[in-house]
Amino acid sequence: SNGNITTLPVSGTSVLTCKSGKAVLSCKLTVVSPDNIITNMSTLPTSSNQDRFTVTVNSYPNVRHYTVYRQSASINASSFKNYMPYHGCAACAAATVLTGFGKNITPKRVTDKNGLEYKAFGKKIWKKNYKKELKDQMPVSLYGINKILNNNGIQTEYVRRFSDAEACQQIISHLKTGNPVVIEAKKGKWANSYHTMVLLGLTDTGKAIIADSANRTGFGSKQRVKYESVSNLIKHMFACSVSGAKSANCYFGSSSGGGYILVNPNL
């Protein structure tokens, strides 16, 4: 009736049966390695053409529930007219990460007055961006997202300069801990210019689970959640320039907007 259960350091499932007299208790146990966490494709959405919905991804010691947003949806709009459809990918990405850590955050709460940007950057920096005309406003930079996450109690490691091989290995290893990675894509398959997305985890088929706030008909029916190998994603990412690697710009600039953020790293 008293004692400890010891498991081997490997993943898998087993059945534990306990008997006491005529009573029998049978439990199915799942052993999870905290450095090899994956999510079965069968549990992930096959259709994600919604304005706002939740994706559940395995983590350690529990699962994480992420809310994924469509940046062009009126339900997710900012107080700044048309900002979210044009520039809202970063705000959506920040909100998605925060929801996975138990915080009830929407993109609007990221951008609006007295919101997360305002509190993390200060009134002067926030106002300078949003008083501009729409075409001159900028999305939050990865540096800015990093600052928002830290300001809300989430540890991060912002990697600004990288080689493709090193980044691929580091991102895969990090995703296997059950924690997300925020990335910036350049113009091409994933973006019309620059675009911020969140890698939520890895599937049992080895693909990254991607939360993408933008509509992409090339992926079929404008899905919010997409799946791609990390090695292919790396081809569309970019590092900060040497001069931009020390930038403290909270809003996007192409020289300082690159890299990726490891969220909740094992520091």
PLM region descriptions:
Residues 202-267:
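Noncatalytic regulatory segments and standalone regulatory/sensor domains
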Residues 32-137, 187, 222-228, 235:
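Active-site-adjacent structural segments surrounding the nucleophilic cysteine of cysteine proteases
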Residues 14, 87, 195-197:
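Residue-level detector of short, conserved catalytic/binding motifs and their immediate flanks
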